[in-house]
A protein has these predicted regions:
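Alpha-helical membrane-anchoring segments
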Residues: 1-366
Length: 366
């Protein structure tokens, strides 16, 4: 006897909205109006410690649209959400997290399709899994992050001694993507995704780390599980959906040519992100008490991600533009430009010997 769990496009978008709402709650400092511990980094302009007055209206519109979209997933409500989210991300690029991008794409795919929605969503999830696995085929994941995940539990710590297992996990994740788009899918394969994401969630809970992505993992497992059920949506994605799938499935390749953002390239737990460190001979009061709690090198250096995660619950958005913004913002802490600088660390995903740093003086960041 075969057991199926069919679900409509309305049900799928409700899963996405629930996941998005939970992620936003776990990163409330990133979204709420008012003063910010970590500044906004807008697409245009400089870093700011306040969200601005009219942002309150945008935030209220977003919350209302999410609620209405969940209650009655009609296109007139769903269309607003990707637009509002992208505007809010433009006002602070830190909001453009991988999970934000994923939910924007899911909602936009549902809003632009009818019978083709299930097919398009399968291809979207396939892109995330395939790129998520492919980006992990590096020593930074197999030698470091995989070992860290294994060491969360004493009983599995020994597995981290075998980098080959890390590469195996990466390949398995890619296989999960392929299974979603095979012509003869088996409904029980959906349990593979539930198991995969459950292990990630359990590890994050045990490590007391990165809680904000737990709802994303839960939503992805639910979407994948239900998308293995038979449906009537066998139509090819329409032009709008094809464009969205192009962004999800092909643009991550452009990251390796410095033409696409790290956060939008499904670099999930790869440990290959660029890092910004601010150096100051004296504590910077713009960071509040985070400098005292998180600084190192005798209190002279602060990893900017530590500050962002402490205040917002997420890492900062990585780009030359945002690094310069945060550098200028922190340089205002000291009147002596010779006592402060921004240090950027870049890695080559496949060559650990190729790490290099770029140092900007505050004078250069002007």
């Amino acid at each position: 006897m075969r057991v199926y769990f069919p679900i409509s496009a309305d049900g799928l978008v409700r899963i996405a909205l629930a996941g998005l709402g939970a992620c936003m709650l776990l990163s409330a400092g990133l979204w709420l109006p008012g003063e910010r511990g970590f500044p906004t980094l807008p697409l245009l302009g400089d870093a700011a410690a306040h969200t601005g007055r009219w942002y309150v209206v945008l935030f209220a519109l977003l919350c209302a649209s999410m609620l209405m979209g969940f209650i009655r997933p009609q296109k007139k409500f769903l269309w607003r959400l990707p637009v509002l989210l992208l505007i809010m991300c433009a006002l602070d690029l830190n909001r453009l997290q991988p999970w934000t991008w994923f939910f924007i794409l899911v909602i936009a795919i549902v809003a632009t399709g009818t019978t083709s929605t299930h097919t398009a969503l399968r291809w979207l999830l396939a892109a995330v899994y395939i790129w998520g696995g492919a980006n992990k085929l590096t020593p930074y994941f197999a030698d470091e992050n995989f070992r860290w995940f294994c060491e969360v539990f004493e009983s599995t710590a020994f597995l981290g001694q075998y980098p080959a297992l890390g590469y195996t996990v990466a390949v398995f994740e890619m296989i999960l993507g392929v299974l979603l788009v095979l012509p003869h899918r088996k409904p029980f394969w959906g349990w593979l995704y539930v198991t995969f994401h459950s292990l990630i969630i359990i590890s994050l809970l045990a490590a007391h780390w990165n809680y904000v992505v737990i709802p994303w993992n839960a939503a992805m497992s639910a979407l994948a599980f239900f998308l293995f059920s038979p449906d009537d949506g066998k139509k090819r994605p329409n032009n709008a959906q094809a464009f969205l799938l192009l962004l999800a499935g092909f643009m991550p390749l452009a990251y390796y040519f410095n033409a696409w953002p790290y956060q939008l390239s499904w670099q999930l737990y790869t440990n290959t992100q660029p890092e910004a460190v601010f150096f100051s001979e004296q504590p910077c009061d713009k960071t509040g008490d985070v400098w005292q709690k998180k600084s190192f090198d005798d209190g002279r250096r602060l990893l900017v991600d530590d500050w962002s995660i402490e205040e917002l619950g997420v890492p900062m958005f990585y780009s030359e533009h945002t690094f310069r913004q945060i550098g200028r913002y922190l340089c205002a802490c000291s009147p002596d430009f010779y006592q402060t600088r921004l240090i950027l660390l870049y890695v080559d995903p496949w060559d650990k010997e190729a790490e290099h740093t770029t140092i900007y003086s505050c004078e250069e960041l002007k």
